[in-house]
């Protein structure tokens, strides 16, 4: 067991609630690494019973490959709801395809976070960089202060070096200098050829978010 770690279902029975138990507690910082390829079919209807929390909706369970349900969209909504109003910051691991979604729950969330200027950055990571999934993932960053005028988009998918984990499977890890490059570029919102851009919220809206 881990000190200060609590096991449970944060979507159905969130541990951190307001004193009256009717809403989520809000925090200065929230991070989330949602489970990928896990079957949530048994709890889908329980999650859907909270429409105020899951304002963009709850994805349907696929008839085949139930574990491919886009449950991460619920975790995005949970993170946003858990940010302290006007000051909270958050980050969440998502499938890279989310940021180009043109319909469905994904697009509803994109419109909300762009229209409200909550999202302020996204870093697309190399394949096989996460231990528990081969899915291409990105890290999405939120800032409830709405103080940013641009969103920084970084493509780090071509970075990293291959190695084999303890099971002999090929994985990718970022080198120290690559991590430094990502952090510096993100903080400075720099535009770097073939690596990053900083775009206004209006530009994102015009392109369909």
Predicted features along the sequence, with ranges:
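N-terminal low-hydrophobic presequence detector
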Residues: 1-2, 33
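Conserved SAM-binding strand-loop segment of SAM-dependent methyltransferases
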Residues: 2-10
């Amino acid at each position: 067991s881990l000190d200060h770690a609590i096991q449970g279902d944060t979507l159905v029975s969130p541990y951190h609630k307001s004193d009256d138990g009717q809403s989520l507690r809000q925090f200065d910082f929230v991070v989330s690494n949602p489970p990928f390829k896990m079957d949530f079919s048994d709890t889908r209807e329980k999650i859907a019973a909270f429409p105020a929390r899951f304002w963009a909706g709850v994805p349907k369970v696929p008839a085949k490959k139930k574990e491919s349900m886009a449950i991460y969209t619920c975790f995005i909504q949970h993170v946003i709801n858990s940010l302290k109003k006007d000051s909270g910051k958050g980050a969440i691991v998502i499938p890279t395809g989310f940021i180009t979604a043109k319909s469905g729950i994904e697009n509803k969330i994109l419109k909300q976070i762009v229209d409200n200027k909550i999202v302020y950055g996204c870093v697309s990571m190399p394949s096989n960089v996460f231990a528990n999934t081969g899915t291409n993932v990105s890290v999405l960053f939120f800032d409830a202060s709405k103080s940013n005028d641009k969103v920084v988009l970084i493509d780090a998918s071509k970075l990293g070096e291959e190695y084999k984990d303890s099971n002999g499977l090929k994985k990718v890890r970022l080198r120290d200098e690559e991590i430094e490059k990502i952090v510096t570029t993100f903080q400075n919102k720099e535009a770097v050829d073939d690596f990053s851009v900083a775009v206004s919220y209006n530009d994102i809206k015009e392109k369909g978010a």
